């Protein structure tokens, strides 16, 4: 959650609809802890205390991922530039449950194609 998305209501988006254009640098132990927490087994990691993990496990969910929603040709494209560990944890749960449309808690911030190009460059053709 960021300052920009703090007031945005969380929604669920299928994992398969979230584009992750940047290669992440991941800590496998952190992902393991998040997956365990999603399963209701609170697990601490380097960046999450046991108390925080217990709160997430009792809620049965991870904090929402900020995504940018871009309207193009009548459909919304979702781009995630952060939340890499949470998205990997959702990806692992999706594979475990064999559900490519596994729901991801997100806060969607509206964006324009021009704004997305600032992140990805002119090679992106979304108009």
UniProtKB/Swiss-Prot annotation:
It catalyses: S-hydroxy-S-oxy-L-cysteinyl-[peroxiredoxin] + [protein]-dithiol + ATP = S-hydroxy-L-cysteinyl-[peroxiredoxin] + [protein]-disulfide + ADP + phosphate. One of its GO terms (biological process) is cellular response to oxidative stress. One of its GO terms (molecular function) is sulfiredoxin activity. It is found in: Cytoplasm; Nucleus. Signal peptide: none annotated. InterPro entries: ParB/Sulfiredoxin_dom (IPR003115), ParB/Sulfiredoxin_sf (IPR036086), Sulfiredoxin (IPR016692). Its EC number is 1.8.98.2. It comes from the Eukaryota. Its cofactor is Mg(2+). Keywords: Antioxidant, ATP-binding, Cytoplasm, Disulfide bond, Magnesium, Nucleotide-binding, Nucleus, Oxidoreductase. Contributes to oxidative stress resistance by reducing cysteine-sulfinic acid formed under exposure to oxidants in the peroxiredoxin TSA1. May catalyze the reduction in a multi-step process by acting both as a specific phosphotransferase and as thioltransferase. Present with 538 molecules/cell in log phase SD medium. This is Sulfiredoxin. It comes from Saccharomyces cerevisiae (strain ATCC 204508 / S288c) (Baker's yeast). The gene is SRX1.
């Amino acid at each position: 959650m960021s300052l920009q998305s703090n007031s945005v209501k969380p929604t669920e988006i299928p994992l398969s609809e979230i584009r992750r254009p940047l290669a992440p640098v991941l800590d496998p132990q952190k992902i393991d802890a998040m997956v365990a927490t999603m399963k209701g087994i609170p697990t601490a990691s380097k960046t999450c205390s046991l108390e925080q993990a217990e709160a997430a496990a009792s809620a049965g969910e991870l904090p929402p991922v900020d995504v940018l929603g871009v309207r193009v040709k009548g459909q919304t494209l979702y781009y995630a530039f952060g939340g890499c560990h949470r998205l990997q944890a959702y990806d692992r749960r999706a594979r475990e449950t064999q559900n490519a449309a596994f729901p991801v808690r997100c806060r969607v911030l509206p964006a324009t194609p021009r704004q997305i190009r600032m992140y990805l460059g002119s090679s992106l053709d979304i108009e």
